[in-house]
Amino acid sequence: MNTNMSGGRRSMPKRKVKTYQQLIQENKEAIMGNPKLMNVIYDRIDRKHQKNLQEQNNT
């Protein structure tokens, strides 16, 4: 049975998933020119760091 006919399942093309750090590296120049975006990134890094500290204190 041919699965490419209508009604059959089609596989989605796979996209490479990038990490947050990879996205920042690739867009570094644009980010550095945008103070609001830099603040968003710093806030996210701060939250992640605080979460890691809390997890270390709980263990």
UniProtKB/Swiss-Prot annotation:
Alphabetical list of InterPro entries matching this protein: SenN/SenS
Any one Pfam family match given in the protein's UniProt record, by short name: Fur_reg_FbpB
Domain of life: Bacteria
NCBIfam families reported for this sequence: Fur_reg_FbpB
Name of this protein: Uncharacterized protein YdbN
Record organism: Bacillus subtilis (strain 168)
